[in-house]
């Protein structure tokens, strides 16, 4: 069972307004939204955590397909296709490590990007 179905089931089985309220607090603080077809989804998909850095892909994004790296002094985005730095600041050493990591994880990044596209997203799936 996927995590979204677990959340939906837990809320459906809530026995009090307090339980429902806690569920709503979790959804609002956890970065969730609803697809047009009524399905729950996560606005941000955590790809990995590495030494305090979070690597995330957001669901409803602008072109080109990219991932975000945040943590410490780093807040930058990189192209999924070629790992070109699109915006933000990152040190030379960290950038080299992110590029190396990208070379090993590109297929997984593409898989996550493609699985998190809402139907109305201006940037569709990446064709490999």
Regions found by a protein language model. Name each.
Residues 1-65, 69-128:
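Metal-centered catalytic cores of metalloenzymes
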